[in-house]
Amino acid sequence: MVTYNEHLKNILTQILDSYHILRDIQDKPGDLDNIKKEMLKINGFLKVATNNIDEYKISHSDFKKLKSKFSHYLENYFFEKEIETMAPLYSKDTHRVKNMRFKIIEALEDKKMIEDMGDLMEKI
């Protein structure tokens, strides 16, 4: 049976994997679909961590702070509509694709959310 800590670690690993894929995208025409896919995966895992993981069952108190950062991200950053609007017009414009990718990365790094995820993973 998977413990809460292991479950949380698996979720954080998948978020960080998608984050690293976003960072490594080369901003070629057609990459907007890849950006959208990774962003949706991140959002889904953040929702799972926020809604389904009980911070009182995690042995490290750092998760409570991180969970509030997840909620902040989900409440304040919404890129799906922008990507849907942008895709038909600018999906081949590498500068706009790059800018969208940077905005998503910047949002993920807001309040040191990504950094804190890595720190918590090391402690679990």
Stretches found by the model and what they are:
Residues 21-36, 54-60, 86-96:
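Charged, low-complexity interaction regions
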Residues 15-23, 43-53, 77-87, 115-118:
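Extended amphipathic alpha-helical scaffold segments
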Residues 45-70:
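Short, solvent-exposed, charged loop/turn and helix-capping segments
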Residues 72-124:
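Amphipathic alpha-helical binding modules
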Residues 2, 7, 16-19, 60-62, ...:
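Helix-centric, low-specificity signal for extended rod-like, repetitive segments
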